[in-house]
Amino acid sequence: MGDHTYKKKDSGIYDALNMLVYDYLLKMKYEGSAKIFFNEAGLENFKPGEGMPILAQWYAAFHDISAVRSGLSSNLQDLNRIEGIMMKLENEKRRYQHIGRIDPGAMGYGGTVDPYKQYPMYYQQFDQRKMYEMYGQMSPTADATPRFYDPRKGSMPGPGYRAAQGYPRYHPRFEEQGVPPAKMAPKQFRDEGRSGNVESPSIATNQEGSSPLFESVLGGGDRQFGLKEVMLFVPSEHTAVCSAVAGEHKILLVASSNKTITAVNLLSGKNESTVETDEKQVVEMKIREYEDEIIVVCGIADNELLLVRCTMKGSANLEIAGILRGHTASIVSFEVLDSIHSLDSGGIMRKWTLNGVFEREEVLSGEILHICCISEDNFMFADRQRVYVYDFELNIEMMEILKGQALGIKRIKDGFIVVFRNQAIWLDKRIQKVKVLNVNESIRTATLIDGDLVAASSQNVWFDNGKSLAKIKLHETGIVALDGVNVFRKPSVISCSASGECKIWIKYVGD
C-alpha cells in the first residue's frame, strides 16, 4: 500500500493523525499491523512538535467512539457525548468555513486562501489541543442552569443535567465566565506574552534592567486609592493559626491554637459557633459554599484531613463531619471544588466526594508542593521550578505557565493568585496574566480588592495606589490570612493576625 494512502506530504496534520493510529495499534497490541502501518505511512522521519499532546486527547476520544460504534458500550451518556463531539466538530467546521468565505483575512492568515486551509486546526504548528475543548464537559453542580441543551430532552423538567447528555447552548467564547467548567481548553491556559510564561523574581533579577513595581495588562488609571479600617474583632484570645472566608454567607472561620474553629458573622463581628477539632491542630482550611451549608476541609499537618460542616439555618452552626484517612505519607496540599483532592509527600493524589467517600487515586511524578483546582479535573501544580497545568482525569501534563518556585496558589472569585517570594501574580479564569505586583519584602499571601492586588508581608500590606507602591501596617503581629470580601456593599479585605485580631478594611478612592 502506498505512502499516499495515509497522508499528504504537504500537511503536517496527517503525520499527527497517522501517529495517533500507530499509537492506537500499539496500545491494542497489534504489533504486526503497527509496524506495517509505520513503514507505509512514512513515519520514520516524523518529528513531534508542539501539537503532540493532542494525541492523548485524540486517543481518548477515538477509544470512546470505537467502543460505542463496536457495541462494547451502550451507556446512554457515552452515546450522547459522542454525538455531541461529532456535532461540535461539524458546527466548528461550518462556522470557520462561513467566516473564511465572508472575510478570508479574518482567520489571521490573510489573502484569499481556501477557508479550510485558514482554520488553525489544519496547521501542525498551531496548538492542536484546541480539539480538547471539543471533548470537554461542564461541571453539573457548578451552576443551577443547564450548560448544555439537548433538543431530544426539550420537554424534560427540572434544572440542569450533565453536560454529557447534550450540546452547548453557545460557542465556548460566549459562555458565562462566572462558572469554571469541568474541562477547559488548554489553548485558554496560554499567556499571550511573547515567551508564553511569566517569570518569577528569582529569574527576573538575572535579566538586564529592573521590572516595574506594578504591571497591568489592563492598564492603570489616574485614580489613587487606600485602605480604611471599618471593623475590628477578636474571635478568640488564643493565637490565630489560619482562617477562611465564606463570602456568600458573610462568615469568617478562624482556627486557633487551642484546637478550635470559630465561625464569626462579618456583618456584626460576633461569634456564632465554636467547635473543638478532636485534639487536632488545624493549620489550613479550604471551603465550598452551598445555600444552606459550608463544607470546610481542614489540613492538620498529618496524613489525614478533617471534614467540618457549618450549617446555615438562622445562624452558623459548626460540627465535625468526619476524618479523611488513606494517605500513608503526610499531606502537602489539598483542594476543594465539587470534590476534595489531596496530595501527599509520596506523590499520591486522592479524590474524595464532599461527604468524605474515597473515589480514586493517581501516582504523580515530581516533587509537587501545591495544587489548585482550575476546574473539577484540571489543576495547577507547583513544584520547585515551575507552575503548570495538569489533567487529573487523563493523568497528563498539559503545559507550563509560570517559572520559579511558587509559595502558594489561591483560587479566588476572579481567577487565581500565584504567590512567589517577592511577587504576586493575578491570573484570570483562563489562566492568563492580568496583573503583577512586585514588592521588596517576603510575601505571605495576597488577595484582590476591586480588581487591585494587595500582598501581605509580616504586619504590612502592599498595593499600587494608582501613583506609587503603597505600604500600610495592618497589625502589630504577623498577618496569617488576607482575603477579599464584599461587606456593607463595598469592596473590602479582611486580615487576621497571629494575636487573634481580625480587621475589615474598605477601599476608598481619593486624590
From Swiss-Prot:
Pfam families cross-referenced by the UniProt entry: LisH
Region named Disordered: 172-212
InterPro entries, per database record: LisH, WD40/YVTN_repeat-like_dom_sf, WD40_repeat_dom_sf
Polar residues biased stretches: 197-210
Domain LisH: 13-45
Gene3D superfamilies per record: YVTN repeat-like/Quinoprotein amine dehydrogenase
UniProt protein name: Uncharacterized LisH domain-containing protein ECU04_1490
